[in-house]
UniProtKB/Swiss-Prot annotation:
NCBIfam families: histidine_hisI, PRK00051.1, PRK02759.1. GO terms for molecular function: ATP binding; phosphoribosyl-AMP cyclohydrolase activity; phosphoribosyl-ATP diphosphatase activity. PANTHER family: HISTIDINE BIOSYNTHESIS BIFUNCTIONAL PROTEIN, HISTIDINE BIOSYNTHESIS BIFUNCTIONAL PROTEIN HIS7. It comes from the Bacteria. This is Histidine biosynthesis bifunctional protein HisIE. CDD domains: NTP-PPase_HisIE_like. GO terms for cellular component: cytoplasm.
Amino acid sequence: MAYSKNFSIEELRFDNKGLIPAIAQDWLDGSILMLAWMNKESLNKTLETRNVHYWSRSRSEIWRKGATSGSTQFLKEIRFDCDNDALVLSIEQNGSGACHTGEKSCFFNEIDSISMNKTAKKTSPFSNICSELFDTLHERSINPLEKSYTNHLLTKGSNTILKKIGEETAEFIMACKDNDKDEIANEASDIIYHLQVALIYKGVKWRDVLNVLESRRGKNN
């Protein structure tokens, strides 16, 4: 088995049909991708092969995610909750997305939100704010809006974008020297925003940055 020798599937609490809910979560940005079901056999197959397998309640059979669509899922980590009756799979999603509709996530229908920005489309539900920001900026680069500051920077090009990064970095340094925590947070946010604009202009994905950070995890940090 590919999992910890200290773990036994018998620790898990399957329902009266022998199933347990499994939530698939993007291993890099934390976005919730889908909810499916597993039985002991599909869980064992997943742990042994690292290719995620679920139990189809409609077809009453095990199915390897993406076997026909190509949208496969590779297991990075798996956890169970405090009641031992639910799983979270940290996975690498391949293909067009986790949802059969072609969306990245199955959870694209919003009921309510306390977000201050009611117009921004959330392409990665429940993901971290930096990934959501990058998705919004990337969308802006594809579908420009009149008077958009982001589109202004992208139109002006490298020199303007890099100049802004330099200015914001200098302001961040001054905020640190002044020990002004509110300004430090504000200027750090400005740097992240302008860095992401530069990445988009250069055709570099935010996930590329996350992949580099992930590769450095635990290396003499």
